[in-house]
Amino acid sequence: MLQNQSHTLIGVTKTAVFFLYAALAIIGFAIGYFIPQIAKWALSLPWIPLEGPLRLITSFQGSTASFITALLGMCAGIWFAHSVIAMLLSVKITDHTVEFIKGKKVQTIHSDDIALVFMDHKRLVLLGTAGYELVREEIDEKPVNVEKAFRQHHYEWATDGDPFKDQFRRWIPDAPDLSQGAHALLKARHKALQDEEKDDIEEFRLELAQLGIVVRDEGTRQYWRKAETYPPKIQLGEGL
């Protein structure tokens, strides 16, 4: 958690991002530099798959070849770091807005639209003024730090968690409580949960919110409740 007079940053900070890029680039460089020796050692084992490619790697000799494989390894490390960071969440909190930053995506929510903030297991939830969920995102931060950050900027924190938790019901396909449109979205979202398609899971959650349906998950099981009004439009933008 990073804090100054104007804002607090929780989750993945810029410092952590820098060190992740640096560490994986160095590791990739080292592996690339020593890959011919690693391949030679692997070929000494009683059985190893991909023997042909490994023999090709052992044919790389000399300082120039080692430098090229090291650069390739460093590029692979940077690419892997970029892929990891794109899945991690940072939250920038000010007195007036909360920004959810994941990769190049930024979701901005104004403080006037936020009624309550709480943690649901590892997920950070922002509740709107009429009971709808503005955001439900998994965050890599200690709950005590999350609570401290939001209280510091005068947001209402729910120590006991979701005040609507007793209203959630497990989704049953084609049950009469929901419209056909809501069932279609929940069915598609259930498949996305099974396939671990995170973008689709979130997109369907937002579409359900426009129907006045709040949804939460336990594994691939979905639980839902109705909100009193539709959520406001949420500002989306591009990150750094």
From Swiss-Prot:
Main location per the UniProt record? membrane
InterPro entries, sorted: CysS_C
Q: Where in the cell is it found?
A: Cell membrane
Q: Which Pfam families match?
A: bPH_10, CysS_C
Membrane topology term: Multi-pass membrane protein
Question: Which keywords accompany this UniProt record?
Answer: Cell membrane, Membrane, Transmembrane, Transmembrane helix
Annotated transmembrane regions: 16-36, 67-87
What's the superkingdom here?
Answer: Bacteria
Is the keyword Transferase assigned to this protein?
no
Q: Which GO terms describe its cellular component?
A: plasma membrane
Q: What is this protein called?
A: Uncharacterized protein YqeB
Species of the source: Bacillus subtilis (strain 168)
Lineage, uppermost ranks: Bacteria, Bacillati, Bacillota, Bacilli, Bacillales
